Amino acid sequence: MEETLRALSESLNALTNVVTGIKEDIKKNNDRLAILEQERGNADPTVDQPQPLVRARTEYELREISVLPDCVKELQAFEGRQEAYLSWINRAQSILTEYDLIKTRPLYRAIVLHIRQKIRGHADMALAAYGVQDDDWDDIKRVLALHYADKRDLRTLEHELGAMCQGSRPLDRFYMDVNGHLSLILNNLKARNHPREVVNALIETYRDKALDVFIRGVGRDCSKHLLVRSPKNLPEAYSFCMGLQNVMSRNFTAQNYQPSGAPRFAGPYQHQARPPFRTPFSPGSGRFSQNSYRTQGPRQAIKMESNRSGQSYQSGYSGRQEEGSGIKRMSEGNNPFQKAQRLYHMELAPPPLAPAASGDNQGRSHEGYYDDESQAVERSNNYPPQKNVEGVTDAPHNLETEGGANFMTNASPVYRT
């Protein structure tokens, strides 16, 4: 009996030791599980760990990826324009969402590679600079959003949308600006982690706000008709404004014989091709430039040379002297103090008879007489009259007309007062 009891006690002790070891192992495993759960709880549950896409390994798979869907082939290329980023990234994401069921097949990787080839220009250079893999779509979206996504928050976009108005812009440009701003707001809402019902309610709210901004910001004539029409959405309001504007523009383009004033607004699709020229601001000048209002002085007179072709040097002496002195010469007919003296108050006296010369002396006397008379005629024609000592004016006379009868004598004619 004692041996049996001893054997049972040893067996119980061995079993107790085994149970104790099992308990320790279970405790260790529980501690490890707690640590793993804690690490998993600290991680972001929305971020999935990227898994490498499956490559084609068989001939059948290669034959399958050689035929890509038409929607992938017709996708437009993205060359790095910021205004086209949102529309392009949404189209590419919608294509990949449709083929999300075959994500573990080589065809999905072929679609991602083809979309990567659509990225060109500066966007391609940005992806190459970051070392992005061609088949990593999540990393491609992250780099493109870093470079081309709008960095404004929702409040800023909402404030800018409420302050928009048409102004001098054409109607189609104003509609594109409002619609583009609304697209930025909707994309910002979709990127948030809100419930689907909340996102849909916010989208409808901002669509109504964009419609209200378009109605209040458009021209006064269209705004009145839009308030009466009460369109339901933004495209309907734009379509109504385009039709109204085209109808109202007919009054100014058609032939009309009735007097009419200036059009109240410009016709459709009219825009200014070139911005108005503005004079650069200068701190030293006033508000208006005075250069164009200054009185321009008279132009400088050009001195003309006298024509000496028809006169001798001696006859033009008085004119040259007056030109050099700067005194303007007046005509003799307009100056009463320099009129030519008339000989109406004088009478011609007969000359005294001179003894006749004989022989050669008579001929020589006549030759000297003719020389003296020719010099006297030239002097009288070139010089103005002068006064003698007694106050009698020696007027110029023409010996050829007045003393023609006395040329054959040796004496000169004598004038008496």
UniProtKB/Swiss-Prot annotation:
GO terms for cellular component: nucleus. One of its GO terms (biological process) is DNA transposition. Keywords: Transposable element, Virion. Coiled coil: none annotated. Residues 258-333, 350-417 are annotated as: Disordered. The keyword Endoplasmic reticulum does not apply. Residues 308-319 have a biased composition (Low complexity). Residues 320-331 have a biased composition (Basic and acidic residues). Its main location: virion. It is found in: Virion. Residues 287-298, 407-417 have a biased composition (Polar residues). This is Retrovirus-related Gag polyprotein from transposon opus. It comes from Drosophila melanogaster (Fruit fly).
